From Swiss-Prot:
Subcellular location: Cytoplasm
Residues bound to ATP: K633
Designated name of the protein: Leucine--tRNA ligase
Coiled coil region boundaries: none
Span(s) of short sequence motif 'KMSKS' region: 630-634
Native organism taxonomy: Archaea, Methanobacteriati, Methanobacteriota, Archaeoglobi, Archaeoglobales
Motif 'HIGH' region: where in chain: 38-48
Family, similarity comment: Belongs to the class-I aminoacyl-tRNA synthetase family.
UniProt xrefs under InterPro entries: aa-tRNA-synth_I_CS, aa-tRNA-synth_Ia, Leu-tRNA-lgase_arc, Leu-tRNA-synth_Ia_arc/euk, M/V/L/I-tRNA-synth_anticd-bd, Rossmann-like_a/b/a_fold, tRNAsynth_Ia_anticodon-bd, Val/Leu/Ile-tRNA-synth_edit
EC number of the protein: 6.1.1.4
This protein's GO CC annotations: cytoplasm
Pfam family, one: tRNA-synt_1
Amino acid sequence: MSDFRIIEEKWQKAWEKDRIFESDPNEKEKFFLTIPYPYLNGNLHAGHTRTFTIGDAFARYMRMKGYNVLFPLGFHVTGTPIIGLAELIAKRDERTIEVYTKYHDVPLEDLLQLTTPEKIVEYFSREALQALKSIGYSIDWRRVFTTTDEEYQRFIEWQYWKLKELGLIVKGTHPVRYCPHDQNPVEDHDLLAGEEATIVEFTVIKFRLEDGDLIFPCATLRPETVFGVTNIWVKPTTYVIAEVDGEKWFVSKEAYEKLTYTEKKVRLLEEVDASQFFGKYVIVPLVNRKVPILPAEFVDTDNATGVVMSVPAHAPFDLAAIEDLKRDEETLAKYGIDKSVVESIKPIVLIKTDIEGVPAEKLIRELGVKSQKDKELLDKATKTLYKKEYHTGIMLDNTMNYAGMKVSEAKERVHEDLVKLGLGDVFYEFSEKPVICRCGTKCVVKVVRDQWFLNYSNREWKEKVLNHLEKMRIIPDYYKEEFRNKIEWLRDKACARRKGLGTRIPWDKEWLIESLSDSTIYMAYYILAKYINAGLLKAENMTPEFLDYVLLGKGEVGKVAEASKLSVELIQQIRDDFEYWYPVDLRSSGKDLVANHLLFYLFHHVAIFPPDKWPRAIAVNGYVSLEGKKMSKSKGPLLTMKRAVQQYGADVTRLYILHAAEYDSDADWKSREVEGLANHLRRFYNLVKENYLKEVGELTTLDRWLVSRMQRAIKEVREAMDNLQTRRAVNAAFFELMNDVRWYLRRGGENLAIILDDWIKLLAPFAPHICEELWHLKHDSYVSLESYPEYDETRVDEEAERIEEYLRNLVEDIQEIKKFVSDAKEVYIAPAEDWKVKAAKVVAESGDVGEAMKQLMQDEELRKLGKEVSNFVKKIFKDRKKLMLVKEWEVLQQNLKFIENETGLKVILDTQRVPEEKRRQAVPGKPAIYVA
């Protein structure tokens, strides 16, 4: 790849020298495209490479389509991860040293110097800038910034004053993900594991021990099923009895630890062996029915309270566990449980759906569940049943006051009533585990008092976001439903913390705005950053009045100039820039940000800006794995952008990552495939270089075929790129055209240069360096700024395409037959009889068998053949659009030499030498073939 790297560096320097990707307002239609700025606690990796390359390919495509494209990027450094990393390096943490030297490619001597957040930011921002330039992104680097810049902090302060004025920031008590070591709420960027974990609210239902005051608090997501409880499950291990707000609770050790992070008054009383309670009874709240306590190994003591209520009619796991226990005489004997206690347990149906009988029983039977070990099948049954009952279920008469209610309503009502009556409570838990902070500590759910929260549960705010979502373009479109659901479920979110890098809350300086909350409207800051980096705008100029005017159009420019100490002309120029560029036309991002950043991006734009400045489109791409393994920047394996470019070159890296999977699918980086692609790209380069400057002679049918194929490719690529389908686009622009060109050259084509201008331009967004090098063999302009090829239907030659497809199919068929004939010397070819050609032409244009036959029977020759014509029409009708209607005799005679060269056989056009049975099978476009 060394020669490719020379080419790449040459054009990167030229682009930078001539500043061709610096964008300012002009008379063209604008296109403002952004990608998430990377977090600088490590080197950029293949995940960044994918998201950023998709963004860059689209930016280049839109630029060549004639748009004035703004494609900027900054660097994200706020929050705790960088501080945590500096501490770990300062402590010479072995695992950290290994990860950063082995996976992030940081030389040990450099790494050991990175003992402060400032040094880390300086090092990785320099590395990131170098990597981003080395892969050839068409970014306007005048607008780069980091989120600890003083000017950026003024911008964030302005944003948060706006949100506070709107009543969208509140102080309250909420459950948050929390690191006990850092004593801080944590967000996705702060985590080593569990980035997608959300906080789930369980209903705790208090089952009191019969003849006692000990409470067995069962945590459930389905409080409405309390009427169907037949027993409770406890794991045969050590639990604790704790005093919780004056009550005695029986909970797992893990649950006790979690309770200490709530607002409850909690005190440990004693540890107990759970087995001493097996066979005893508890009272079911509301219905006052007694049910037994039974052992279950499946109970997860690290999930909620570690005590589980059993509803076998509506919970497939419970039903399977009860049936297993009935057969497990050893366990029953071990804990002194009378078998009759378990035998007497019968499911209690309490929800009506279209499932007859006991719903859990029916699903278990249908799925073939044999025992509780069939976890996947039971998971499937549970999800199916819960979804059906939640959306369509009606509570039956045995559910007291809740009879006749929809399950979705009863769930809320039962929860409220249990809590009101003192029979229920709330327990917060993670949706998935483990959740590990970057410092290595296991996180908990903590109920935090007097914390600043973004009021995302505000119904009016949600409705505005939901209404705008319907007007937006989401790519792929099925993600719109996911956005809708996540917006509906989004709750108030802690937006501040006491430790980390970042901007302090302007009205409460003890708190710092956390890293997901200071990165929601920074796309607007790119407009300001150009002036900041030019030295025309400083932090002291960025008064609230200035930002109100340039970003919202509020105020009078003269007064703003006075307050900000800037000229009226400069302020107006910045305002005009903002008016020209905003809103963001496309935000292209990885799918990991759908549940957080992209939601907050929508909420904050809708809150702060007028509707005409709200985002227009969001595109969501999948993850990247490495040789089938999930990548991790904190644990490995990892492929850095820098290493990929050094090893394979920029254009190979770009082409591969764009073609590895369609936009919304996950991609897998496979070194062997990358090396194969590098060879393909080299062949393309050499092919164009050898043919580009050749004179184009008189055009043949074969040349017209090549031009036609190029037009098909142009149409396909444009359609694909308009929908951000980069795999489809690269496939058409590179791989399929390479196949066509190979065929063209096999056929003896000599005018390849006729398509090379279009081909170079077509491929330029994907492999810009090689295309720039080739383009300059003939032109002085930058191909990156040329017009993208337009589809021209008048240059499509369907007849030429049919001829080449006919020949390709014929050669392949002969070669296939030849495999089964030893010592083959000749091939006899017999095209279909004339009457079949005549019939096929009618059938090809007909939409109805009857109509076709009616028309054909008007022909005297065909009428004589009667039944034979009828059978033939039926045979070809289904695939009539695929019929290869060419002048076969003429095509064969003109291409005898080619067929002979390709097959190594002497071609004889003699129908009589082909066996009659084979001749009868011939159809137009698919002649009878006999190899001898």
